[in-house]
Amino acid sequence: MKDILFGNHTVNHKSMPSLTEDQINSEVMDLHKAIYEKFGYGMKYIRPPMGEFSEKSISITNSLGYKTVMWSFAYEDWNENKQPEESSAKKKILDNVHNGEVMLLHGNSKTNTNVLDDIIKEIKNMGYEFKSLDEFK
């Protein structure tokens, strides 16, 4: 699994602050176990669904060995039935590139699929590098 980093996003994409401690444990650890059984990979980063978290949910996920990671850029790409135009998506993404960026692009987006190669090339041409979360301090 070299060069691949899996992050936890929970099993059912529920708002973390609305869940009990047992529900948070289940949402996180059920996915953790499934990924480990399938790939032999132990995840250590979590992105809370919808970016919703509380002190309680952060404390619980920390106790499970997770570090919470948020994003510094996202755009409306998640709705499969309302995809942005490719040209406007490229412009939006490229206009917001910055040092240390954690870019959130949803994998179910056909627009992202179609523009990702161009985006990566353009960002590299701007002098930026792509790094794993493990490489950041």
What are these language model-derived features?
Residues 111-137:
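C-terminal domain-boundary segment and adjacent tail
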